């Protein structure tokens, strides 16, 4: 079975590359537009550092230094921010429910990563699925990777225990936060958590229950709130059925 999965994963990687190449002109256009939108958003919200200078905007708190200390550095000058102020973790649902659109998701991941990188934002791309009771988080592109080719290795299989995947991503950010102090997690999801492994009995669920439906959504929402309490910003790109749109909002 493992050999068969490896062979299927390699075939899917080839299909992902072929799909992106076939639609290269469209994807390039989307990257350019998205890059411009991200750059404009950064400019609007950017808080540039100000350094002491001999020209620029007069600093009232330093004016006294000119006559008393013969110090002409009584101005503030905007200084370009060379270091990124935040990182982005892009998390792709790689469960079997995504089998029908693997090439599209791989292309979306590449487009988002390329656009963010073009704006100087460090980005890491990971995928997740659950196999035989284990949730697997796979890093396709790390912060230090210049190449985006690893995203072509996106491959869907198994289930999606979203809550556990979100918790694992939080642990990954804690272990390897990247080169910036603030962090944004973007989840590409159909908002339909589902796993074959049942939830074990607990005081709230004496008989246990299936992981899916409202329980799965509540579990994922609770993990999102926990990440937010830890200082991470969490956003979602919804790509599921209209019937699940309300769950995505939760």
Tell where the protein language model's regions lie, with residue ranges:
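Von Willebrand factor
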Residues: 64-65, 80-140, 143-188, 193, 218-221, 226-228, 235-239
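Alpha-helix N-cap/helix-initiation motif
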Residues: 97-106, 154-162, 209, 213-216
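Acidic, Ser/Thr-rich peripheral helices and adjacent loops at domain boundaries
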Residues: 136-153, 204-214, 250
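Extended, charge-rich low-complexity regions and/or helical-solenoid scaffolds
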Residues: 82-92, 114, 124, 173-201, ...
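Generic recognition of flexible, low-complexity loop/linker segments
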Residues: 74-79, 94-95, 99-101, 111-114, ...
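Acidic/polar low-complexity segments with low predicted structural confidence
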Residues: 1-85
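VWA/integrin I-like adhesion module and closely mimicked acidic/polar interface patches used
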Residues: 191-249
